[in-house]
Amino acid sequence: MELLRKVSGYLTFDNICTALSVIGAVYFVINRFILHRAPVPSSAFKHVPKDLLDECIKQLKKQEKRVYEDYELPIALRRDLQLRPDDEEVLKRLLCSICDHMGIDGSFIKLIISDTPVPERAGAISTDLAFTTIWLEMRPPYVTDSIIAVLAHEVMHLHLYYEGIRRQDNWENEILTDTAAVYCGFGDYMYKGYAVNQGEMALSYRKVGYIRQEDVKYILDTIGKQE
C-alpha cells in the first residue's frame, strides 16, 4: 500500500506529459537518425488490401484503350520547379505537361493554387465536361515529386471520367485513381511523391496520396509480371 501511494504521487499530469515527451523524442531520434526513416507508424495510413489493388489493375487492363509510356518531366520544367515551386505559371506548365502525356488538352483547365492548409487534402478537381478546375494545396517544404504526384492524381480523375472508368465506393475510386496514375506511366513520381516527408516543423511529417510507397511498388511489380 505504501508503494502504491509513492507511485501514485509521481503520476501527476505534468509527470505523465514529460514521460510521453521523452518517449516520443527517443522514438523520433531512433527512427530519424539511426533507422533513417520517417518516425510515423504505418498504422497512420489506411491499409489498402492487395485484393483491391489487383481488382483495380484488372479493371484498368480491361477498360483502358491506350498503352502509356513512362512519363518524363522535361528538364527545363524540372529546373523551374526547383527554383520556383509555388509559381502559378510553372505549375500550369506542369499540369499541361501531365495532361499532354494523357492526351488531354490542359490549356482549358483552371488551376487554383491555395496556401491555406486543408486537412486530409492535397488537391481536388471539379468538372462538368465543359469546364474543369483543379485545386492544388501548396505549403512548404515543397517537394517536386509530391507536386507531380498530386497533379497526376487529379488529372487521372479527369481521364477516368472521360473514359467512364470508376468504382462505386468513393474510397475505392480514389485507390483506382492512384493505381491508374501508376498504370499510365507516373509510377516513379508516385513512388517518390507518396513518401512521408518532413513538414514545416522539426517533428512534423506530411504524406499525400491514398496509397503507400509499398503499394506503388506492388502495382509496378504486378504490371511488370503481366506484360
Over which residues does each language-model region extend?
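Active-site recognition of the HExxH zinc-binding catalytic motif
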Residues: 149-163
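Hydrophobic (often cysteine-bearing) scaffold residues that line and stabilize catalytic clefts
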Residues: 91, 148, 173, 177
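Metalloprotease/metallohydrolase-associated module, dominated by Zn2+-dependent proteases
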Residues: 165-227
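Auxiliary, metal-adjacent structural segments of Zn-dependent hydrolase domains
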Residues: 63-129, 140-145
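Short, strongly hydrophobic alpha-helical membrane anchors
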Residues: 1-11
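Hydrophobic or amphipathic, alpha-helical segments that drive membrane association/targeting
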Residues: 30-81
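Short pre-active-site segment immediately N-terminal to the catalytic Zn-binding motif
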Residues: 135-151, 171-172
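N-terminal signal-anchor transmembrane alpha helix of single-pass membrane proteins
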Residues: 13-36
